[in-house]
Amino acid sequence: MSKNVILKADNLYKSYTTGKESFEALRGVSLSLEQGEMLAVMGSSGSGKSTLLHILGAMDAADKGEIRLNGELREDYGTEPAATKIRAEQIGFIFQDFNLIQDLTVEENVALPLMLAGENNRVIWDKTDQMLEKVGILEKKKNAITELSGGQRQRVSIARALITEPKLLLADEPTGNLDYNTSIEIMQLFLELQQEQDHSIIIVTHDAMVAGYTDRILFLHDGQVCDEYRCRKNGDDMDHIVDKFKTLSLKKGR
């Protein structure tokens, strides 16, 4: 039996205008994500992958198209005040540059979404400890962000994304600033969240190793889905994923 579709996007378009120039970032992109599925979005620079993730994360609004979240058509998706509520309650977003507040401790960064929501202190700090333990960094909770390695900072970012208990996680190049071994550790953490907590995850990446951890890969080129690949998740298809990405890069250079 197939699982419930947690997120479905149909025929998304997005354009940006700079001066007299207009640029189509997305041209009719459609996708669906099942509960407990992990999906990678790959594409060369300028393919529209980050724009797509920001729209799916209710951080921007599409010009045209439909988005259904948990089966509900949301015509207000990406527009305020609905977008803030969607982000706060249903989506966890993880950034490449971690997006942490340097003046706060580890635990304060993780607790911030609950503080802003007006949760009571006991719930805030109990859940903060739970999330930090889940990502394997509880012993660093009193540390300053500046005292952490890149991998540790990304774990803090993931814990913060989890604190409101969203079922949907969106990650924009989550290993982009990490070395190879640390990237593997972070992807294994995502895999644990998927398999043990039934999280649905979309990861934008240019890294074939990262994409190989997911269930499916959508390849974007020039604002459109140009290919889709279902991963074996055993490492045997890494060369195939790399070849597909190289093909997109060659198209970009023409």
Per-region residue spans from a language model:
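Short coil-to-helix segment of the ABC ATPase nucleotide-binding domain corresponding to the Q-loop/switch region
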Residues: 104-112
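A short, proline-enriched helix->beta-strand linker immediately N-terminal to the Walker B motif
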Residues: 163-167
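Conserved ABC ATPase signature
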Residues: 144-148, 152-154
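ABC ATPase NBD coupling module
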Residues: 20, 74-92, 238-239
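Catalytic Walker B motif of ABC-type/P-loop ATPase nucleotide-binding domains
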Residues: 169-172
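Helix-to-loop junction immediately C-terminal to a conserved catalytic motif
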Residues: 57
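Conserved ABC transporter NBD signature motif
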Residues: 65-75
